[in-house]
């Protein structure tokens, strides 16, 4: 079997062609390669990038961003809508709007603004985001103001309108209109308004509460009608130019998009009949990405392409306006996840491994407890009895032995042999089970969870991939090197935090999703590094400082001809910064260190040396040192 391993086998094992979308590949040296311009562009070895970053003073864990992927994703999105508009002879245009909540990093926003030129806009959902957008948006470009708004938010948005931006204030709740009317008069500026309608249609998935009747935002049908009446009474009906709705986030099934569009177009038709001069339809978010590469309706996948998504939206609007004899509205999408997810990879190093027992039978003691003798009898019958019977019997004796140990009736040495015997049986049983046998599948799942190594990884799930903990999000993971070697172990990844949730339970592989990941045995003196891919959407913003692990080091890698350059490097958070954030007085800490050194009776050079070491700990990286090159 080992002779059959090659680079294609590695691609298949880690499902790289399916989730990589042309941006990720494996070269003949077994290195992960990143192609920022897609499959036809130059590729760069991720291990080489990491080594160069370390040479320039950066440390692991390391967030590696590829800004050129952002531009490529935007171009794909714009191209898909241009194609659909042409095929359907649609008279309206299209603008891609980026909701900066997905990733507010200035470099991300600036890259997309530069790449989008005039066919691009920004969305803000809060006052801080609006302040960033007012400075970053191109003059004359579209800006969408979503989220709940107070008078100050609306005043700031109207100031942006005076400054030449096409700012649409989207009414999310009825009370916002009062602030709009008051502030518009005070500033002597005519607003551009939108209305967010709350669709009954809802897509299945982990983010379904962002759409549908139970959605947090948007107006009900009665509230929409009341808004139109109030605008008419205030002489502002002509300012309502935009209809907005949100079908959900990471919509997996293209049929859900079609259903949502069917309902949304009815709102457009009905509002137009009421004399509302709508000329923009903002379909919000929902365009997903295929994290697991299965092209399915799984929550972490999608069963459609960007082209199919664009065609579904354009077709829905084209058919609606044609049947009603209406003017085709301009289309806006807020597909932030699809723009940003692929552009970032978190590179982490394995600091240690806890391996499961290899399966050899420990020698018997003359006075061995009965529970151990029973397990040996099970082992002796491996070749003569059905494997499921043996597995269930072994589980029974394991639980019996664990109970005896808790009652003080089994020694620590006997407790250790209990585990060794059980794992010897479990390994043998696992080899005799087949996933083709339906009756074997539950036992296989249990054994696959038990018979895996623990790989201790130098990072925090809560800081770097918080959606793994929060919503069981799946991100593709693979070793970044040694992929020309067949992995001989299976493992689960656990992080540095003192929390049982600081682990990854599900992994992308060739068959979809599994409870463990194929990995290599560690080599003495050689770093073993993994890439956690597609972390460019939401993860940096949602990251949590559990155990005071802060932001990691980061580097932006930009294509420069046939090579690459580091466009920007950022050192991660230090311990003093994290302690200051949670209210510690740093100088008081230093004074305390000196006082404790003196109280311990230490003075002179030794005292100074200890203080220097403590101070270095205070100003150091919050993560572990890698220790090998």
Q: Residue spans of the language-model regions?
A:
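A non-catalytic, amphipathic alpha-helix used as a structural packing/dimerization or gating element
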Residues: 68-76, 226, 263, 312
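Active-site-proximal beta-alpha core segment in soluble small-molecule metabolic enzymes
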Residues: 89-282, 287-292, 303-308, 316, ...
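Flexible, glycine/charged-enriched surface loops at secondary-structure junctions
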Residues: 60, 64, 86-91, 274-278, ...
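Short, glycine-/Ser/Thr-/acidic-enriched flexible segments
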Residues: 31, 39, 69, 103-105, ...
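Conserved, well-structured core domains of diverse proteins
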Residues: 1-59, 558, 565, 574-576
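Low-complexity, highly charged intrinsically disordered N-terminal segments
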Residues: 26-99, 104
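Charged (often Lys/Glu-rich) extended helix/loop segments that serve as interaction or gating elements
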Residues: 314, 318-629
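Short glycine/threonine-rich loop-to-helix capping motif typified by GTGT followed
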Residues: 251-259, 290-308, 338-353, 544
């Amino acid at each position: 079997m080992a002779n059959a391993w090659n680079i294609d086998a590695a691609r298949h094992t880690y499902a790289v062609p399916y989730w990589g979308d042309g941006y990720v590949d494996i070269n003949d040296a077994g290195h992960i390669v990143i192609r920022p311009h897609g499959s036809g562009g130059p590729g760069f070895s991720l291990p080489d990038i990491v080594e160069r970053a370390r040479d320039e003073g950066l440390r692991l864990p390391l967030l590696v961003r590829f800004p050129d992927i952002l531009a490529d994703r935007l171009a794909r999105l714009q191209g898909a809508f241009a194609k659909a508009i042409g095929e359907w002879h649609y008279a309206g245009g299209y603008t891609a709007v980026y909701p900066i909540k997905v990733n507010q990093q200035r470099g991300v926003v600036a890259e997309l603004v530069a790449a989008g030129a005039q066919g691009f806009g920004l969305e803000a959902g809060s006052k801080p985001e609006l302040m960033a957008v007012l400075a970053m948006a191109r003059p004359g470009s579209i800006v969408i103001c979503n989220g709940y708004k107070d008078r100050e938010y609306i005043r700031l948005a109207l100031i942006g309108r005076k400054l030449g931006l096409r700012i649409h204030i989207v009414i999310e709740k009825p009370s916002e209109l009062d602030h709009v009317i008051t502030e518009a008069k005070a500033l002597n500026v005519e607003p551009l308004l939108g209305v967010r309608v709350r669709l009954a249609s809802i897509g299945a998935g982990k983010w379904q509460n962002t759409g549908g009747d139970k959605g947090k935002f948007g107006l009900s049908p009665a509230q929409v009608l009341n808004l139109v009446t109030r605008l008419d009474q205030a002489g502002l009906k002509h300012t309502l130019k935009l209809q907005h709705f949100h079908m959900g986030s990471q919509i997996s099934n293209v049929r859900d998009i079609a259903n949502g569009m069917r309902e949304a177009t009815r709102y457009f038709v009905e509002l137009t009949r009421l004399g509302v001069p709508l000329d923009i339809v903002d379909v919000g978010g929902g365009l997903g990405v295929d994290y697991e590469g299965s092209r399915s309706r799984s929550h972490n996948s999608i069963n459609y392409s960007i082209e199919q998504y664009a065609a579904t939206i354009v077709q829905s609007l084209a058919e609606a306006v044609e049947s009603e004899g209406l003017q085709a509205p301009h289309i806006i999408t807020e597909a932030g996840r699809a723009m940003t997810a692929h552009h970032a990879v978190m590179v982490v190093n394995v600091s240690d491994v806890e391996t499961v027992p290899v399966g050899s039978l420990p020698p018997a003691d003359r006075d061995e407890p009965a529970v151990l003798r029973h397990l040996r009898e099970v082992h002796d019958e491996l070749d003569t009895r059905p494997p499921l019977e043996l597995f269930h019997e072994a589980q029974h004796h394991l639980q019996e032995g664990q109970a005896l140990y808790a009652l003080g009736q089994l020694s620590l040495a006997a407790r250790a042999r209990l585990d060794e015997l059980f794992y010897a049986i479990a390994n043998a049983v696992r080899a005799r089970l087949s996933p083709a046998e339906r009756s074997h599948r539950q036992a296989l799942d249990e054994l696959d969870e038990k018979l895996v190594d623990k790989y201790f990884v130098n990072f925090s799930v809560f800081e770097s991939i918080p959606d793994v903990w929060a919503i069981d999000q799946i991100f593709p993971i693979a070793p970044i090197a040694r992929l020309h070697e067949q992995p001989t172990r299976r493992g689960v990844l656990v992080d540095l935090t003192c929390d049982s949730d600081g682990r990854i339970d599900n992994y992308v592989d060739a068959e979809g999703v599994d409870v463990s990941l194929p990995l290599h045995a560690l080599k003495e003196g050689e770093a073993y590094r993994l890439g956690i891919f597609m972390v460019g959407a939401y993860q940096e913003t949602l990251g949590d400082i559990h155990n005071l692990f802060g932001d990691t080091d980061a580097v932006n890698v930009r294509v420069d001809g046939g090579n690459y350059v580091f466009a920007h490097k950022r050192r991660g958070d230090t311990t003093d910064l994290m302690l200051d954030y949670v209210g510690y007085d740093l100088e008081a800490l230093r004074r305390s260190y000196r006082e404790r050194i003196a109280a311990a009776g230490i003075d002179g050079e030794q005292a100074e040396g200890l203080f220097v070491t403590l101070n270095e700990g205070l100003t150091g990286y919050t993560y572990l040192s890698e220790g090998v090159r």
